[in-house]
UniProtKB/Swiss-Prot annotation:
NCBIfam families: rpsG_bact
Family per similarity comment: Belongs to the universal ribosomal protein uS7 family.
Role, per record: One of the primary rRNA binding proteins, it binds directly to 16S rRNA where it nucleates assembly of the head domain of the 30S subunit. Is located at the subunit interface close to the decoding center, probably blocks exit of the E-site tRNA.
InterPro entries: Ribosomal_uS7 (IPR000235), Ribosomal_uS7_bac/org-type (IPR005717), Ribosomal_uS7_CS (IPR020606), Ribosomal_uS7_dom (IPR023798), Ribosomal_uS7_dom_sf (IPR036823)
One example of a Gene Ontology biological process annotation: translation
Domain of life, source organism: Bacteria
Species in which this protein is naturally found: Acholeplasma laidlawii (strain PG-8A)
Oligomeric and partner information: Part of the 30S ribosomal subunit. Contacts proteins S9 and S11.
HAMAP family: Ribosomal_uS7_B
SUPFAM superfamilies recorded: Ribosomal protein S7
Name under which the protein is recorded: Small ribosomal subunit protein uS7
Keywords, in A-Z order: Ribonucleoprotein, Ribosomal protein, RNA-binding, rRNA-binding, tRNA-binding
PANTHER family: RIBOSOMAL PROTEIN S7 (PTHR11205)
Amino acid sequence: MPRKGHIVKRDVLPDPIYNSKLITRIVNTIMEDGKKGTAQGILYGALNRIKDQTGREAIDVFNEALNNISPILEVRARRIGGQNYQVPVEVRPERRQALALRWLVQYAKKRNEKTMEERLAKEILDASQGTGAAVKKREEVHKMAEANKAFAHYRW
């Protein structure tokens, strides 16, 4: 905890093409070793592929995918009386979005298509249809929270 008060969260600038802060955030999630140009190339390429394949606006498909990936509940470890309990808690909106973006990129990297652009496009399409590894991860997290519902009264 900082001694000098609350730390103000810096806001990201919207990206130049889609004018969306969400797109900037996923570019930052994809980026490795400070190579933002490469990350933007991957994302814009993936969004173009999505638009070609579906005939819909890529940003709409992307938002739909994020809604399907975003977790509502998660479990947090809480130590009470020398024992650790997995306590289900609601996920704050900002963390919800961050987790969704992180899972999307993480599971896109694990796919076996040839290029990252292709993998990301396929994972976004799968997520928008309610399938794919990222959606499975969300279901897993929800199942864990549901299983530990008995400890919900330990919430803080």
